[in-house]
UniProtKB/Swiss-Prot annotation:
Domain Barwin residues, every copy: 1-87
Upper classification of the organism: Eukaryota, Viridiplantae, Streptophyta, Embryophyta, Tracheophyta
Protein name: Wound-induced protein
SUPFAM superfamilies in alphabetical order: Barwin-like endoglucanases (SSF50685)
Disulfide bond annotation, renumbered to this chain: 15-49, 29-85
Organism this protein belongs to: Glycine max (Soybean)
InterPro entries in the cross-refs: Barwin_CS, Barwin_dom, PR4, RlpA-like_sf
Top-level taxonomic group: Eukaryota
Keyword Transmembrane on entry: no
Induction cue: By wounding.
Length: 102
């Protein structure tokens, strides 16, 4: 993919309980919201993981860890929702996951 595609959003690995898995999720976008502060951002799925949630790149983690508690606790609790980023998938029900600190 071109740099403009790769740099539009922060990156995450995805292995959540709902939604496409593996290769089918790659390139899709999520709106990720810190449940403690309401801070949110859009990320693009670029990999898969095995922890049952999301594995955010450090820039994204820091962007939504606005009160520093995620870093202190070693994880964030977030809601995530599939959003349109130029792909056809648009799931509207928010989901819940726990993220480990970078």
């Amino acid at each position: 993919k071109p740099y403009s595609w790769r740099s539009k959003y922060g990156w995450t690995a995805f292995c959540g309980p709902v939604g496409p898995r593996g290769r089918d999720s790659c390139g899709k976008c999520l709106r990720v919201t810190n449940t403690g502060t309401g801070a949110n951002t859009i990320v693009r799925i670029v990999d898969q993981c095995s922890n049952g949630g999301l594995d955010l790149d450090v820039g994204v983690f820091n962007r939504i860890d606005t009160d520093g508690r995620g870093y202190q606790q070693g994880h964030l609790i977030v809601n995530y929702q599939f959003v349109d980023c130029g792909n056809e998938l648009d799931l509207t029900k928010p989901l819940l996951s726990i993220l480990d600190a970078p």
